[in-house]
């Protein structure tokens, strides 16, 4: 199963153009599944059953993994076994029967005006790094973009003619 997982991660990267974070998460999830199944005596993709995957899901629940982690693991397994079906390794996807747990959505915490002021005044503006950090914090605060979006910005994304 190790080779199939490696090929799947390469497929995600080369064909689907997934982010590095997605690839790392999927690989971690699938390696955890592979280890669990190996302990159960299942070491080939062709031998994996829906019952095996259901047992793995119950194991994750017993180990007190968060609902969001279990949900992502199920998504990883579904995608992996769908890939195996497309490659002709399986006739049907054993992960299709898995149901993701309900994820409780928590509202993000809100900073007070004082906390925002304190945060925005942290960078020392007498250095280039401080000016950069201040600009990044101001952009995050003013627009609400995610940190991953901020990090992904390129110079050509910025309108310098304002």
Residue ranges and their predicted role:
Residues 1-162:
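Conserved catalytic core of the tyrosine transesterase superfamily
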